[in-house]
UniProtKB/Swiss-Prot annotation:
Origin species: Mus musculus
Protein name: Reticulon-4 receptor-like 1
Any GO CC annotation of this UniProt entry: side of membrane
Repeat region (LRR), residues: 55-76, 77-98, 101-123, 126-147, 150-171, 174-195, 198-219, 222-243
Tissue-specificity statement: Detected in brain (at protein level). Detected in retina ganglion cell layer and inner nuclear layer.
Amino acid sequence: MLRKGCCVELLLLLLAGELPLGGGCPRDCVCYPAPMTVSCQAHNFAAIPEGIPEDSERIFLQNNRITFLQQGHFSPAMVTLWIYSNNITFIAPNTFEGFVHLEELDLGDNRQLRTLAPETFQGLVKLHALYLYKCGLSALPAGIFGGLHSLQYLYLQDNHIEYLQDDIFVDLVNLSHLFLHGNKLWSLGQGIFRGLVNLDRLLLHENQLQWVHHKAFHDLHRLTTLFLFNNSLTELQGDCLAPLVALEFLRLNGNAWDCGCRARSLWEWLRRFRGSSSAVPCATPELRQGQDLKLLRVEDFRNCTGPVSPHQIKSHTLTTSDRAARKEHHPSHGASRDKGHPHGHPPGSRSGYKKAGKNCTSHRNRNQISKVSSGKELTELQDYAPDYQHKFSFDIMPTARPKRKGKCARRTPIRAPSGVQQASSGTALGAPLLAWILGLAVTLR
């Protein structure tokens, strides 16, 4: 049984742990515990606000005017950081050094960022979602995704990327979604997607693709969705798509397809394909212009002899002169860098490799993160609804990470739970309550 007077000490202890006595949350921000969350979104901050608690796990700083990030701005306890739609132009290479708990990092819609150091994301062993869309990136340095074995969602859409070197994604053995649409890619080499053995969705539409190596998709045995529409492709060999044994949704429309003899292998592959595909409208020859390649007959290829197009079959090595010649037709939006260093390791021999079919990412608050962002990628796919949409519903497609539309106006629905702490601009709000409790304690004595 408690002493009669001990209730005073007990009340004071509870008060000290629960009331905001003049600090603990940055000015103009909202904070709440379990997990410790700081929301400073849309407050016109030009720099990271001071006073972010050291134990903060979730930090929301989107829709401000922050210009740079450096070491010391955040604590390694951080699990989630949303800092999209700011004015970030520079991220110090060691900004996230030691952040072994970080799982979700949204840097999207910082249109003046343009370049990243190779070591920017080094050591983020638990990172499972990385957003780099609309960042003005023209190139990605070799090794930038090295060691990110837990990464599942990578958003690189709507940048100015012209070229991706072989093995740029080789360490991403658990990646399931790769969004590269809305860039300026004009070719896909043999080793670009090497090692992506768990990739489920690959979006490459609205680039400038003219050429795809016939082994570009060699490792993508689990891919279910491939979008290649609105590019500059004229041909694509059936051998290129043959490894995609799990493919369900394919979009090839919006290209100037040559439906002559060079299209025979693609036509044969499409005849065998049992998934849903868009139309493949012919641009040439003139007599087939406007026809759907899928609907051509055997008789249309009866006079075709010899091997399929050597343009796609040969092992094509992109030389510096090749790239320079291509860039004359597609001016760069920034200096592209080719720093590829093929690793040469089979998927099973790389450190951190996990067997296909397992979701190996383990983190503390997956349900919360997924709930906050549910509905994003469904919107993405509906935005580019294929002309075969009547054959299936996007609502029954596998659950996946969403994409935000437009200006990235996602706002965190902060509802003040018990223990909410609102930063104050003057006198501590707990003082009157403290006086009342002390008076009650004296009365009880």
